[in-house]
């Protein structure tokens, strides 16, 4: 009973302290309660392991195959190895050829299969030297009496072996802590996976509140690949994302098209699979009950749930790391070369997912070295397996490594961009590094990631229940650091946190790059939860009602933790304005607007909106059939073809030159920047019934301006010429306003963001001249945004200029003007890169707006 009371006291103190850790200003005792609870928990866990040690998994052995089978296995392995080497040589010389990639994959498979056959069926588990276990019979066994035949000599009676303390402990373990039957364990795993799926699918259309542009930016890379762009499987793409992930995306798009489901499932599926893989890993480490607890903690973990609901690649490194560790643990237990080979293969394939997998590689190799130090027999028993693991990892990672070797920029560029060394150099001090370390250590229970896409800003990454048991598990793991299982989770969390600690201080704490720590957190929390369960069960384990009551109490604790995560994510986080705004509501609303009108109306989008990746992705229609072809089976998720990425179902809007529109019998809709709400008079010049509307988000903030034009107005205005106000523009080849203009026209207003081929390829320059019609006397503020340079003349004198090439330039000034016309001139040049020119003013008593045609008069 003492152990049970100590464990309950430890949990109570830790839980109470963790609950108030975010409010240490008003609850200064919280850190001390937490520390006291953790220390008391270590003592309680030590007592329970002393008084009632957990049942240990029997060690299995794999026999070395002999004879022909062994020779065939070795031939298969070494044949695969040399095939892989030949493929790597070909990939080094020609990385874009698919036949080399297929040969490389075939060689890896041959190596893994051959290694798995070198060790055969399981040997007797008690072949290890040492004392044999005393046979224990649970329950009553009925003896069958046999009548002795005549002449048969009676056998001498054998004395029943005396039970040892170890055998009695084993008997009690099985009587009062029985292993679940296989069907029971499978049923519980299915229930836990169902919970994990529910947390990751529930209200997926509303939370996150939109598709973030990172999701669709990478998806566009995959669409370019589908369209035939020559991308090596072993190269890198957007933000140095390995192309392996890009090619995986193409599979989703072949099956599901460019749909919302295709984006989300590529992270939901690995998120759920991580829960399953972690269950297997925890079972290898601690047994069935801790495995079920571990999977449950990860199933509803808000940190992992939030990231799993992105359509992005950050969920893959935790999955690959957990799988690799599972095969390593099983390989060490069974001495199976096949498991060692698969572990290296999985970790190597993980390198093709997301950059944070590099931390997983460090975790695993440091763990292997650490285990060799604390377990003297580990390398003696497994040196061949460890060598095979390293070899399989090396040959799997090698093609991507070739890319990094040939172009080191692709290896280190992103790392340098986000490195905390930028802050350290700016501060000329290690203080940013120390502060980042502090923030990451406090992210679990005090203050979490402040990025609204990663977390409810500032909220701890763990709920109080998970957080309390995580701290108890962490303290216990530190105390038992010589136990390689506990040492692993300490290494796992510590190394993974470096991915955030070494990032820019402004991002700290960073939940995105440290997501792979979430499974280790679940392992620690489950370890402490299981030990607490055993401690409470110990004093009354002989009584059924006590066992049932304890089990219900622990299930209630899990349910409470799940509920806290549900409320935090689906209520608090879902209602947060910061979270809503972080998921780019403008891009998402424009995409929904285009999808609703696609095919039924002419659609024109201003240049900024035109290039939004969610719009381009969700409205994509391939130029040729895309899907799956398996012999006579042809399947495509796209119901019709289109113009691909080069020619979407909408056009780029340039209202100054687009009007009047061609008559197609359809209405037309312009989706424009908010600046155009001040230019409705220009639309009404051609279309009296045109209607403009400011589209707002759910918070009431303006997003963009929508103009709808009826088909009848379009037909009536065909051929009409514009004779209103504006500035006379003379367009010249070259950037110095020399020679004859290649184009002269009246531009009603200056809101230009030209595509690459307009108004002419290469450098050009423009001079706009005319009169500015000031409506009243007063102070007028002007702003000219140009890319590249611009000079502004008023009343024959230069009022302002900024003429630096190859960069955006802004001219701002305030002038006192009298009512009436004022001669103005704007000189603009473009050398290369972005092409933009915008002319704004702020008249007295009015908001900032483009200078409209009613206030401009051009002179031929």
Summary of predicted features, one role per range:
Residues 715-860:
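Acidic/polar, compositionally biased interaction segments
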Residues 190, 390-394, 527-568, 720-721:
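Signature aromatic-anchored transmembrane alpha helix within multi-pass, membrane-resident enzymes
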Residues 111-126, 130, 322-342, 350:
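Membrane-interface transmembrane helices that cradle and orient dolichyl/undecaprenyl
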Residues 631-721, 732, 860:
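Aromatic/acidic, Gly/Pro-rich catalytic loop(s) in extracytoplasmic/lumenal soluble domains
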Residues 217-233, 255, 331, 349-352, ...:
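Transmembrane-lumen/periplasm boundary regions of multi-pass, lipid-linked membrane glycan transferases
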Residues 207, 460, 466, 544-601, ...:
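Membrane-proximal, lumen/periplasm-facing interface regions of secretory-pathway glyco-
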Residues 307-308, 359, 464, 469, ...:
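Hydrophobic/aromatic-rich transmembrane helices and adjacent perimembrane loops
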Residues 265-286, 323, 469-475:
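Transmembrane-helix motifs of polytopic, lipid-linked glycan transferases
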């Amino acid at each position: 009973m003492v152990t049970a009371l100590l464990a309950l006291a430890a949990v109570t103190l830790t839980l109470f302290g963790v609950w108030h850790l975010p409010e240490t200003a008003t609850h200064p005792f919280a850190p001390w309660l937490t520390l006291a609870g953790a220390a008391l928990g270590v003592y309680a866990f030590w007592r329970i392991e002393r008084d009632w040690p957990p049942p240990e998994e029997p060690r299995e052995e794999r026999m070395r195959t002999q004879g022909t089978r062994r020779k065939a296995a070795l031939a298969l392995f070494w044949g695969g190895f040399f095939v892989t080497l030949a493929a790597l040589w070909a990939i080094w010389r020609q990385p874009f050829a698919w036949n080399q990639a297929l040969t490389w994959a075939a060689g890896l498979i041959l190596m893994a299969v051959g290694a798995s056959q070198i060790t055969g069926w399981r040997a007797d588990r008690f072949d290890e030297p040492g004392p044999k276990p005393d046979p224990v019979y649970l329950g009553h066994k009925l003896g069958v009496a046999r009548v002795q035949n005549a002449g048969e000599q009676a056998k001498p009676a054998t004395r029943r072996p005396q039970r040892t303390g170890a055998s009695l402990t084993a008997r009690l373990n099985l009587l009062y802590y029985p292993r679940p039957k296989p069907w029971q364990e499978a049923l519980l795993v299915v229930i836990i996976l169902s919970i994990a799926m529910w947390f990751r699918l529930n209200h997926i259309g509303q939370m996150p509140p939109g598709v973030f542009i990172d999701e669709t930016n990478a998806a566009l890379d995959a669409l370019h690949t589908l369209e035939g762009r020559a991308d090596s499987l072993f190269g890198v793409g957007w933000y140095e994302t390995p192309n392996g992930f890009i090619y995986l995306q193409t599979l989703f798009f072949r099956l599901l098209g460019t749909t919302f489901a295709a984006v989300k499932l590529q992270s939901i599926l690995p998120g759920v699979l991580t829960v399953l893989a972690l269950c297997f890993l925890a079972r290898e480490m601690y047994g069935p009950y801790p495995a079920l607890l571990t999977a449950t903690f990860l199933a509803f973990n808000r940190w992992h749930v939030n990231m799993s609901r992105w359509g992005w690649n950050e969920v893959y490194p935790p999955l690959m790391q957990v799988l690799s560790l599972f095969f390593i643990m099983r390989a060490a237990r069974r001495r199976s070369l096949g498991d060692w080979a698969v572990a290296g293969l999985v970790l190597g394939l993980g390198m093709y997912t997301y950059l944070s997998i590099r931390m997983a590689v460090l975790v695993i190799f440091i763990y292997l070295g650490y285990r060799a130090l604390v377990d003297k027999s580990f390398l003696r028993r497994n040196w061949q397996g460890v060598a095979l693991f390293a070899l399989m990892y090396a040959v799997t990672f090698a093609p991507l490594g070739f890319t990094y070797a040939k172009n080191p920029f692709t290896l280190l560029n992103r790392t340098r961009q986000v490195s905390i060394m930028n802050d350290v150099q700016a501060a000329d001090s290690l203080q940013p590094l120390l502060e980042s370390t502090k923030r990451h250590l406090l992210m679990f229970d005090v203050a979490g990631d402040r990025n609204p896409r990663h977390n409810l800003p500032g909220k701890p990454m763990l709920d109080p229940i998970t957080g309390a048991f995580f701290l108890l598990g962490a303290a216990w793991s530190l105390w038992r650091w010589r136990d390689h299982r506990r040492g692993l989770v300490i290494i796992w969390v510590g190394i993974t946190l470096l991915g955030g600690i070494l990032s820019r201080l402004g991002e700290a704490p960073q939940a995105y790059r440290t997501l792979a720590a979430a499974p280790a957190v679940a392992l620690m929390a489950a370890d402490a939860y299981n030990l607490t369960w055993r401690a409470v069960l110990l004093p009354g384990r002989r009584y059924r009602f006590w066992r049932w009551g304890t089990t219900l109490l622990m299930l209630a604790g899990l349910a409470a933790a799940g509920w806290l995560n549900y409320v935090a994510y689906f209520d608090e986080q879902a209602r947060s304005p910061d979270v809503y705004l972080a998921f780019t509501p403008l891009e998402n609303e424009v995409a929904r607007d285009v999808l609703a009108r696609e095919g039924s109306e002419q659609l024109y989008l201003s240049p900024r909106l035109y290039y939004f990746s969610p719009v381009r992705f969700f409205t994509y229609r391939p130029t040729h059939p895309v899907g799956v072809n398996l012999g006579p089976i042809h399947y495509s998720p796209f119901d019709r073809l289109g113009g691909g990425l080069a020619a979407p179902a909408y056009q780029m809007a340039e209202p100054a030159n687009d009007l009047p529109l061609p008559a197609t019998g359809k209405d037309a809709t312009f989706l424009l920047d908010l600046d155009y709400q001040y230019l409705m008079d220009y639309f009404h010049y051609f279309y009296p019934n045109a209607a403009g509307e400011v589209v707002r988000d759910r918070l009431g903030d303006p997003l963009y301006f929508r103009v709808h034009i009826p088909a009848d107005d379009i037909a009536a205005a065909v051929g009409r010429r514009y004779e209103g106000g504006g500035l006379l523009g003379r367009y010249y080849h070259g950037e110095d306003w020399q020679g004859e203009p290649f184009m002269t026209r009246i531009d009603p207003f200056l809101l230009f963001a030209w595509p690459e081929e307009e108004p002419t390829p290469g450098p050009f320059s423009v001079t706009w001249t005319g009169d500015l019609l000031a409506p009243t006397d007063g102070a007028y503020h002007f702003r000219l945004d140009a890319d590249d340079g611009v000079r502004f003349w008023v009343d024959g004198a230069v009022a302002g200029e900024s003429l630096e090439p190859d960069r955006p330039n802004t001219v701002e000034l305030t002038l006192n003007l009298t009512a009436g016309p004022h001669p103005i001139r704007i000189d603009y040049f473009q050398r290369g890169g972005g092409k933009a020119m915008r002319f704004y003013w702020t008249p007295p008593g009015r908001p900032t707006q483009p200078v409209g045609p009613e206030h401009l008069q051009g002179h031929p």
